[in-house]
Amino acid sequence: MRCPKCNYHKSSVVDSRQAEDGNTIRRRRECEQCHTRFTTFERVEELPLLVIKKDGTREQFSRDKILNGVVQSAQKRPVSSTDIENVISRIEQKVRTTYENEVSSTAIGNLVMDELAELDEITYVRFASVYKSFKDVDEIEELLQQITNRVRGKKKRLNNDETN
């Protein structure tokens, strides 16, 4: 592994452990020339998974596309990068275990929406506003009503749990 500082081609592994997602190995390395320490990640090469887009075209599954959409939706929200990474890992794991060779972009979008609904309501609404391509204000109001009902249901369950 080349050193990111001096570009020397030899480094030694100082520490190695499984990352939080369980599918990645995190390694701390040290350059044998300049002694700079840096981190690398190793993961199993996945078989290509194709995403069938709404227009029928196919493209390779991209974890980064999902990550970028979620990061944009979570801007200026109290959502940590660790939370986002965990959401993306769960989505990718569900996609890879549920679908063999191809998955529709709609199925991926629905998985993202499900995860964001649990993570942060505002992030969910922001993502939905782009993903769902609302035609008018009534559709947005309907989504907000669904979220409000779900939040009220959660609060009601919490209150019932506290009184029992």
Swiss-Prot record:
PROSITE patterns: ATP_CONE (PS51161). The keyword Transmembrane does not apply. A zinc finger (unnamed) spans 3-34. GO terms for molecular function: ATP binding; DNA binding; zinc ion binding. One of its GO terms (biological process) is negative regulation of DNA-templated transcription. Keywords: ATP-binding, DNA-binding, Metal-binding, Nucleotide-binding, Repressor, Transcription, Transcription regulation, Zinc, Zinc-finger. Binds 1 zinc ion. Residues 49-139 form the ATP-cone domain. NCBIfam families: transcriptional regulator NrdR. Negatively regulates transcription of bacterial ribonucleotide reductase nrd genes and operons by binding to NrdR-boxes. This is Transcriptional repressor NrdR. The lineage of its organism: Bacteria, Bacillati, Bacillota, Bacilli, Lactobacillales.
